[in-house]
């Protein structure tokens, strides 16, 4: 397993296409999200010049995970798509970045998950950190999230915000991450969502997790 970081400005067209294809396979083909994107390629208006990416690769070199970081001084997903989740509390601060389009899924697992079981709403507003409990048994997922926090800290971030399903803060806390809700959860598109804040610091020694088999795919 290898995790690397790259900015959108540094990224060549070939790598951008690889990320877009991977995200399409995860979010559209596997999780069944209804996104406004061309067949085979998922990018949105937040994949702009100021975006940064974390990429997880298998030993074979195949892309098996990704995450996007956005500065809150620029337009970002929580601010533009989900402002109702943090009314009057939307950060616009160099020390706060947003985590979105977070996913960990091996190409061998593409299309194998039951879409009906996916926690994410099947619409463009479905930007969630993960697909419920089993995914947090994945050491790859924890490693990618910690790498995102470390990289964000190198960019000047002290905390990240992300749109998450109710309960994800508890799971993150159990995994050793320091989280809190910016505001009470709300129902959006039939799903209970909230704006989650994650501190950019090394995680604590986690409490033991008793989870099922891992099959990791998240968002946003």
What is the predicted role of each segment?
Residues 39-45, 183-186:
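Short, solvent-exposed loop/turn elements at beta->coil junctions and helix N-caps
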Residues 190-211:
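C-terminal "cap" of GNAT-fold acetyltransferases
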Residues 44-54, 74-77:
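A short helix-loop-beta-strand connector motif used in the catalytic cores of GNAT acetyltransferases and
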Residues 1-40, 53-57, 63:
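Short amphipathic alpha-helix that is part of the acyltransferase structural core
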Residues 58-91:
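Short, His- and charge-rich active-site/binding loops that engage polyanionic ligands
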Residues 77, 83-179, 183-193:
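Acyl-donor binding region in acyl/amide transferases
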Residues 51-55, 66, 96:
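Short hydrophobic/aromatic beta-strand element in the GNAT-like acyltransferase core
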């Amino acid at each position: 397993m290898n995790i690397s970081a790259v900015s959108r400005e540094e990224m060549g067209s070939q790598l951008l296409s690889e990320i877009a294809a991977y995200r399409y396979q995860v979010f559209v083909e596997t999780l069944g999200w209804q996104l406004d994107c061309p067949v085979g390629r998922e990018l949105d208006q937040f994949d702009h010049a100021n975006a940064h990416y974390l990429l997880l690769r298998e030993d074979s070199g195949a892309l098996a995970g990704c995450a996007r970081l956005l500065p809150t001084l620029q337009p970002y997903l929580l601010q533009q798509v989900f402002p109702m989740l943090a009314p009057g509390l939307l950060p616009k601060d160099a020390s706060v970045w947003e985590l979105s389009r977070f996913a960990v899924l091996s190409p061998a697992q593409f299309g194998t998950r039951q879409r009906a079981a996916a926690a994410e709403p099947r619409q463009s507003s479905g930007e969630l950190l993960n697909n419920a409990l089993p995914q947090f048994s994945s050491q790859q997922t924890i490693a990618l999230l910690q790498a995102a926090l470390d990289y964000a800290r190198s960019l000047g971030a002290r905390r990240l915000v992300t749109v998450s399903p109710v309960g994800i803060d508890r799971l993150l806390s159990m995994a050793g991450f320091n989280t809190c809700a910016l505001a009470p959860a709300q129902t959006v598109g039939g799903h209970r969502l909230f704006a989650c804040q994650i501190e950019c610091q090394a995680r604590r020694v986690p409490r033991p997790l008793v989870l099922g088999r891992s099959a990791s795919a998240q968002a946003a």
